[in-house]
UniProtKB/Swiss-Prot annotation:
Gene designation per UniProt: NCED5
Residues that bind Fe cation: H305, H354, H419, H600
Cofactor remark: Binds 1 Fe(2+) ion per subunit.
Record's GO cellular component terms: chloroplast stroma
Biological process annotations from GO: abscisic acid biosynthetic process; carotene catabolic process
Domain of life: Eukaryota
EC number: 1.13.11.51
Biased composition (Low complexity): 37-50
Protein name according to UniProt: 9-cis-epoxycarotenoid dioxygenase NCED5, chloroplastic
Residue stretches spanning the membrane: none
Pro residues: compositionally biased ranges: 51-62
Native source organism of the sequence: Oryza sativa subsp. japonica (Rice)
Amino acid sequence: MPTTFTPNSPASSCSIHHRASPSRGARNSVRFTRPRAAAAATNSVLSAPSSVPPAYVPPPPPPPTKMFPEAGDAAAAKAAARRCGKKKDGLNFFQRAAAVALDAFEEGFITNVLERPHALPRTADPAVQIAGNFAPVGEQPPVRSLPVSGRIPPFINGVYARNGANPHFEPTAGHHLFDGDGMVHAVRIRNGAAESYACRFTETARLGQERALGRAVFPKAIGELHGHSGIARLALFYARGLCGLVDPSHGTGVANAGLVYFNGRLLAMSEDDLPYQVRVTADGDLETVGRYDFDGQLGCAMIAHPKLDPVSGELFALSYDVIKKPYLKYFYFDADGTKSPDVEIELEQPTMIHDFAITENFVVVPDHQVVFKLGEMFRGGSPVVLDREKTSRFGVLPKHATSSLEMVWVDVPDCFCFHLWNAWEEAESGEVVVVGSCMTPADSIFNESDEHLESVLTEIRLNTRTGESTRRAVLPPAAQVNLEVGMVNRAMLGRKTRYAYLAVAEPWPKVSGFAKVDLATGELTKFEYGEGRFGGEPCFVPMGGAGAAASPARGEDDGYILSFVRDEAAGTSELLVVNAADMRLEATVQLPSRVPYGFHGTFINAGELATQA
C-alpha cells in the first residue's frame, strides 16, 4: 500500500488526500506514515499541496487578460513600423493597388472558397489548439516582491526563464499551438526572495511587420500550410513580398520553443529561423536585442535544441532545410562563439529533426520517419508525413568531424523520438546509449489521428562496430506513463546519468505533474500537481546554481526543480520549487497574472546575468 507524505518530512512516497480549506476551497493535504528508510516500492507518488498556509492572503486578482493582446502603445507600433513593416500610408500607388488586390484575393478566394467550406482538423483548429490555459496573454512589465510560501533555497540566485507560443493576433484560419509568437516568462530570485515576474514577446522581424500592418500576414507553418489553401497562402505571401508589402529577408521565425544561455547571451529559438537574443534587465524585465547571427557567422536556421557541453563550453547545433539540399547541416561553436565549418549530412528526403544528443566525443543525429513531402499539398494533404516505408536510424558523428563520411548510421526500426534527454558512451561494449521518449503515432502532434498517443521513455543502444541496435522501455509495463519535455542534470549532459526529470503528459496535451526516473532500475517517483492543476517542463537547477558540476560529494540529484503551474479552478498561476532529491515541495511563488502552458526553459544564474553581452 502506498505511503502518504507531509511536505518537509522524511517520507519518500505518498498518496493524495483532500480537505476543505475556508480560504481556497479544496486543497491537498497529506499525512506522514513511515520514514524514508522503510520505503521500497518501485513507484511512488508525491502530491503538490496548494502550498498556501491558512494564514496566507493571496494578492488581489489581476485584471482579466485579453484573449489576444493589443499591438502595444503607439511608440512601440511606430518603432516596429520603422524596423520591419510598411503601413499603407507609406506605400506608393502600385503597392497600394497590389495590397488591395491581394487582400481581396485572400478574402474572396482563399478564405471563402478554399478554407471556409472545410472543417479544420483538431491539429489546426484554434478553438482546440489555444483553448483554456493554452490561450495567449498580454505582456506583463515586472511585478515586484512576489508572495512566497515555504522557503526558497538561498543558493538559487538568478532568473528562471521559460519560452512558449503566444499568438499576438487572433487566428483567422488554421492554427497549431506551435505557430504562436514567442513569449518569454521570467521569475527573478535572489537570497530566498522572488523579486519579480515579467513576460514579454520576443520581438521577431515577423512580429514587427505584422504589428505595423495590424494583422497576421506571415503563413503559419503547421496550421495553415496544408492542402490547396496552403499552396495559395504561400503564393500570396510571396506575392506580397515581391510587391514590397512584407520583407521575409529578415527572417520568418517565431522564436517560441527553446532557450539557451551561451557566451553571454540568452537565445530564444525556433527551428525555422536564426535565434534571437533576449536580455534580462537589472529590474527583471526582458528586452529583445535582435536576431543573432553569431557576428555574421550563421546564415541559416538553427534548431531549437542546441546542446551545450558542460565541460568544453562548446555549443553544438543542427540546421535542416525542407526545400533544397543539403537537407541537414551540422556545426558547432567553441566557447568563445567561433563557428566551425558546416558538415553537410546527406539525407534522401527532408526530415523533421527537432532534437539530437551529444556524448563526450560524439553527436547523435536522428533520421526518423516523420518527413516533409511538399507534393502532398497538391493532393490536398499535409506536407508533414509519416513515411512508413522509411527505416528510422541514428547517425553517430565525431563532434569535431569535418565530413559526413565520418558518420556511422545504425538502424532503429519504427522509432520516432521528438526529444532526446541524454546520451553517453560505454567503453566496454562500444555502444552509444541514447535515452529519449519514443512517440506513437509518430506524426500525432501534426496530423489528426484516432490512435491513442503514447510517449514511452526508452533506452536505445547503438553498436557502432556492428551496426546493430537494441531498445528497451525504461519503465515496466504496469508503470507506463507518457513522459515528455524535461531534462537531466545539465552539468552531466553527454555523460552517463542515473536520473531524468520529465513531465507527466497526461491527460494529453496537459501536464499533471513530473517524474523522477531512475534510468537504470526504472524506479519512478511522481510529483503530482493536484486535481485541476497542470504545468509543463520541469527545470533542474543543480545545487550551487546553473553550471555547477556534480561530484561525489554532491549527488547528481542534488538540486531543485522549478515549474510553472496553473490552478484552473482557482484561476491562479504559481512557480513551484521542489527538492530534486526527495521530491518534496520547498516553496511556492504566487504569480501576479496567468502563465499559459508553454515549452522549454532554462535557469540563468546571477553571475551569468552580470556578464550579459
